[in-house]
């Protein structure tokens, strides 16, 4: 009987420890529509901005200041239009020609339905870099040029009628984007002036789905 009792105690202790780890890994959360949390040089936003959006809760591992780790539990209806963009944002505040390098790194997982993982930067015009997507989603505007190689990655470029959008021809859940090279490609092509880079964000545009979308890590440096 004592052995059984000890085993039960040990099992309970293991479960309690596991639960403690799970809770402590997310030390801050919000269900507020525009809830945000400052983490080092980044601000993490819940950003539930679309029409007809459903509930969403943002969880943040507040120990991950150098490469934010956060996730959104979101339940969005199967209607058109982006409902939310939970993201990590960093202000760059340098002109395009002044930067020698600017790289966006990402590692993501999860998600069902219709969504796209993307960088969204303001230079000051909007420039998006899609890294992975699923379901009934697509960029604004129309195709401008296909199979453009920038910084070792091949993109299809969209613009007329919308922001400049660079969609990887080979989607990935983990990798990097040479943001400086993308901005300079636009400047050298006469598509942008040498503007000041404001915010660069990375996250997921959720159109529909009931799931958890996780940024295991991301950074812009």
Language model: regions and residue ranges:
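Bacterial N-terminal signal peptides
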Residues: 11-20
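Beta-sandwich interaction modules
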Residues: 81-95, 165-193
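Extracellular-facing segments of soluble proteins and assemblies that are Gly/Ser/Thr-biased and enriched
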Residues: 76-145
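Bacterial N-terminal signal peptides that target proteins for export
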Residues: 2-11
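N-terminal segment immediately downstream of the Sec signal-peptide cleavage site
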Residues: 26-73
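Sec/Tat signal peptide C-region and signal peptidase I cleavage site
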Residues: 21-25
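Short helix-loop boundary/capping segments
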Residues: 124-180
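Long, compositionally biased interface segments
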Residues: 173-221
């Amino acid at each position: 009987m004592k052995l059984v009792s000890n085993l039960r105690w040990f099992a309970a202790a293991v479960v309690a420890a596991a639960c403690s780890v799970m809770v402590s890994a997310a030390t801050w959360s919000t269900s507020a529509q525009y809830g945000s949390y400052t983490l080092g040089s980044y601000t993490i936003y819940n950003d539930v901005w679309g029409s007809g959006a459903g509930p969403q809760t943002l969880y943040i591992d507040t120990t991950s200041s150098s490469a934010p780790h956060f996730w959104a539990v979101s339940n969005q209806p199967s209607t058109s239009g982006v409902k939310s963009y939970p993201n990590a944002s960093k202000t760059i505040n340098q002109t395009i020609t002044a930067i020698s390098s600017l790289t966006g790194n990402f590692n993501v997982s999860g998600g069902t339905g219709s969504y796209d993982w993307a960088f969204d930067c303001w230079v000051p015009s909007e420039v998006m870099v899609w890294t992975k997507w699923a379901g009934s989603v697509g960029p604004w505007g129309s195709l401008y040029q296909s199979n453009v190689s920038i910084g070792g990655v091949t993109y299809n470029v969209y613009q007329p009628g919308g922001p400049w959008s660079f969609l990887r021809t080979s989607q990935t859940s983990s990798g990097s984007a040479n943001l400086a090279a993308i901005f300079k490609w636009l400047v050298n092509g006469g598509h942008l002036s040498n503007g000041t880079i404001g915010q660069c964000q990375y996250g997921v545009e959720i159109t529909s789905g009931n799931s958890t979308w996780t940024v295991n890590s991301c950074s812009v440096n």
